[in-house]
Amino acid sequence: MNRREFLKCGAACGALASAGCATGDAARSAAAVGKSGDCPFRLGVAGYTLVNFKLDESLKMLKTWDVGEFCAKDFHYPLKASAAELRELVKKTSDFGVHLYGAGPIITKTEDDARRAFDYCATLGVPTLVGVPAEVFDASKGWAGNRSSRKMCEVCARLADEYKINFAIHNHGANPKTGNPNLYPTVETTADLITDLSPRIGFCVDIAYTHADGFDPSAILRKHAARVFDVHLRNVAVADNGSSGAAADKGVIDYVRIFRTLKDIGYSGVCGLELANAYGKPSEANPGADPSWVPRSIGYFRGLMDSI
């Protein structure tokens, strides 16, 4: 499927998402944008979902899908842009009826990196920085050569207090084929590094990786409720290492229970759909990769939000 075909698909499926209709047993009629019924949290889209599209295209798709929450990524809102340039991009985003709820994930390896990231978030006007405070132990390995850093966690916790911006560490999975076992693989390994630090440093809980690593996502959300600042949503076709993408209503993760848990703990942030693998070519890992997964998943999740 080329870009033009995808955009046509997105427009057609957007009507499904906006109406809140979705296939699958758990689908329900949905409310309007973001918050549904008395559900305390909102539905958004993580920037990485639209990594293959320019900002204008992405904003048009979000408008088509009637999604009003978006997480900024560097390829849409460049980290190296001037403050004036970033403010122009924020205005453009707002003109499409879209609100930036956070930024990241952003890897920070030095205090200068971290301060630059916080300055970026302050200019964007977002309350949450999704980050990966890291140190390099083997530069030849690229991403795999980074590992968790207590020192950088301390730096980011201090800056979170200074800027009054929450810092949410993203778990990237313990399986070396799909994640990095040395770099905040799970929420629990991250918790060991931060629970004595500022309450402004916490978690961006990736539900699929949490499930793939053998944890009960609902139990993790309850245990760490006070430090959950962001949640990434995607589903997997089978109970594997977290790589087999699926539309939300076709996977194996129990999102009905997870959404009820989020409501029970009073989570009032955004749950961001992160489904970039839907835009890849079908493969053994993604045998049914299909761009319609995104609007279809939006409709499904809205239905769940309306039903809980």
How should each PLM-predicted stretch be described?
Residues 4-16, 20-42, 51-63, 184-205, ...:
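Histidine-acidic metal/acid-base catalytic patches
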Residues 41-46, 70-72, 100-105, 129-131, ...:
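Hydrophobic faces of well-ordered beta-strands that scaffold small-molecule active sites
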Residues 80, 139, 281:
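Glycine/Thr-rich phosphate-binding loops of Rossmann-like dinucleotide-binding domains
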Residues 10-16, 35-37, 56-57, 63, ...:
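Active-site acidic/histidine proton-transfer and metal-coordination neighborhood
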